[in-house]
């Protein structure tokens, strides 16, 4: 069982690796849209207390997909090797349509299994997080 620490994806917000390789399987931890080395979150405007004023789900989707790709590639895998994606949205009603359209653009060729769930919040002020399984 190998621990994967990406040099391109954002730093984890807790004590966990970006991914674990077990045999030919790669299990990714929850990946959000933050950029490596930055506190700002793409597409998010916060007030002085850190509360969300507004956010752009499309910008966050594109950023989170970029981060997932970084972890996959740093682990020796690639986008086409994704087999399962669990998506966590904090606002299913307002964001699902945009997210689903962008998801389709990224996954037209490789169509992994997918589950999308709405949750109350995520550990940082983000609107989307992905948990993925891939093969190496």
Per-range role (PLM):
Residues 1-136:
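Short, polar/acidic, helix-capping and beta-turn segments at strand->helix junctions
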């Amino acid at each position: 069982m190998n621990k994967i620490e990406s040099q391109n994806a954002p730093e984890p917000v807790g004590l966990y690796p970006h991914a674990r390789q077990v045999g030919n399987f790669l299990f990714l931890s929850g990946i959000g849209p933050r950029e490596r080395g930055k506190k700002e979150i793409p597409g998010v405007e916060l007030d002085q207390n850190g509360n969300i004023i507004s956010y752009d789900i499309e910008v966050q989707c594109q950023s989170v997909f970029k981060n997932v790709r970084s972890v996959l590639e740093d682990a020796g895998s690639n986008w086409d090797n994704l087999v399962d994606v669990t998506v966590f949205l904090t606002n299913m009603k307002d964001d699902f349509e945009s997210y689903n359209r962008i998801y389709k653009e990224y996954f037209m060729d490789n169509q992994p299994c997918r589950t999308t769930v709405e949750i109350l919040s995520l550990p940082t002020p983000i609107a989307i997080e992905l948990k993925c399984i891939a093969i190496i």
